[in-house]
Amino acid sequence: IMGYKGYQMEDKDYLEFYEKLQYLNVSIVPEQKQGYFQKKIQVFNNSVGYASKEAGGNLIVKEQWLENPEWTIYIQIKDEESRELAERIMARKCTYMPYLGKNDHMADISGMCIVSGEERFPKNETADSLVPEGAVQFDWDEMTYRYEEYLPVGLKESTNLYRTHRFIFTDAEMDQCMQPVYKVEGRNLLFF
């Protein structure tokens, strides 16, 4: 969206997009029952000789992607970088076409708006967003679902590979919040 450089930058510790956006706070609400999306696996076979250095020159690639994912993503506007990102999203002004993981999986960005939220520390209410592990103590007695997954939260400086953190999506009530929860459009959101 912002036009920052990515993986072709080999002379810096971090990639430009990460240097600029690593402090951006987001909250992600899966718009799928229980937060789980069906996955699809496709195997590609490229048998042209230059595709692989292996004997026989046959390259086999196995890809996995989510089927019809849908999230509502909230961006906390707190500095010039996040303000510019919000303005570009609202104006549908992207330097490059946004995509999900791979450029043949285009992102469909819709329903953009600027909203306000109220900072709270609720008890006996559910979180509507993904919750970083350790941010909330839950009462697991009455829950009907609990989805957990390790997701990328940053890059390692030495390798530019993902740093991951465990996230929880559940209908269990929050017992204690270690970080603020924002009430936005009737939803309880945690930012990370």
Regions from the language model: what does each represent?
Residues I1-M9:
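N-terminal ordered "arm"
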Residues M9-E19:
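Short, glycine/acidic-rich hinge or "gate" loops at secondary-structure transitions
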